[in-house]
């Protein structure tokens, strides 16, 4: 009996040592790469020639919402000239926001004078134009945009299983005045391609959304995610899908 007891005790100790070693190994494996190193590798995958800063093109985007409605948008971006234009269909009309440097032009079916009701219905404000400029250049410029001033790249990289797949996860926050949300970017551990990103307005409340990326469009040497499916963090409810149907060269302005 005594001999058996010692065997069991030794076996228990070995199991504990194995578990401890496994946990230490798992943690160190994720930390073979730092946050900045992961970001560098991801940018090398998506923009190997460093062309994003000179991006000049038009994105044709189809947005399909959960209720089946479709919205078509054309987004033209010339980063070098600080040019941005969004043209989108809304309620049977075409809304356009054009920004060149600090000059903003708002249009509704080509006209630039609006009633108060039109301004409210179609969100025809300069603030909205700036928001949409930041929205599209950020989302379609990832992961390169994570090099922008104000981004705080956490040094720790987490290895995490999400939706049945394993990823390297980079955490990013922003300096005050730049952004308030907490962001998490999920990269393929082999290719370093960006596969998912997730944001929280308040992590404690588990609010916000996650966006699943599939397929790619290659334009000017940049690998741009083609399809983005949006879901709520809480409950995983499906919201919408943005599909990049075409990328074309932007004609000279």
What do the predicted segments below correspond to?
Residues 37, 44-113, 150-158:
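N-terminal mature ectodomain segment of secretory-pathway/periplasmic proteins
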Residues 14, 46-56, 79, 165-166, ...:
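Short, surface-exposed loop and linker segments with low hydrophobicity and enrichment for Pro/Ser/Thr
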Residues 1-35:
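Bacterial Sec-dependent N-terminal signal peptides
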Residues 34, 41, 45-49, 92-94, ...:
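Intrinsically disordered terminal and processing segments
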Residues 31-37, 106-180, 204-207:
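Flexible, processing/modification-adjacent segments and terminal tails
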Residues 161-253:
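Gly/Pro-enriched, hydrophobic low-complexity segments
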Residues 93-106, 111-129, 237-252:
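Catalytic loop of the DD-peptidase/beta-lactamase superfamily, centered on the K-T-G motif
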């Amino acid at each position: 009996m005594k001999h058996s007891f010692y065997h069991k005790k030794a076996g228990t100790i070995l199991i504990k040592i194995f578990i401890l070693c496994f946990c230490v190994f798992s943690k160190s494996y994720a930390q073979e790469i730092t946050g900045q190193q992961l970001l560098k590798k991801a940018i090398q995958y998506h923009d190997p020639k460093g062309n994003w800063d000179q991006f000049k093109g038009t994105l044709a985007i189809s947005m399909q919402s959960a209720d089946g409605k479709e919205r078509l948008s054309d987004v033209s971006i010339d980063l070098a000239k600080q040019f941005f234009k969004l043209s989108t269909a809304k309620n049977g009309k075409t809304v356009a926001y054009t920004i060149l440097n600090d000059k903003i032009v708002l249009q509704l079916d080509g006209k630039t004078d609006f009633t108060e009701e039109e301004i409210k219905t179609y969100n025809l404000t300069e603030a909205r134009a700036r928001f949409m400029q930041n929205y599209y250049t950020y989302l379609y410029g990832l992961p390169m945009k994570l090099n922008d001033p104000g981004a705080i790249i956490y040094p720790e990289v987490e290895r995490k299983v999400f939706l049945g797949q394993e990823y390297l996860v980079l955490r990013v926050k922003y300096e005050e005045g730049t952004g308030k949300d907490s962001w998490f970017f999920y990269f393929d551990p082999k290719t370093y391609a960006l596969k998912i990103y997730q944001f929280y307005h308040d992590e404690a409340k588990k609010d916000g959304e996650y966006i699943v990326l599939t397929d790619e469009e290659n334009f000017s040497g940049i690998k741009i995610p083609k399809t983005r499916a949006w879901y709520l963090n809480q409950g995983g409810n499906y919201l919408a899908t943005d599909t990049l149907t075409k990328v074309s060269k932007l004609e000279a302005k």
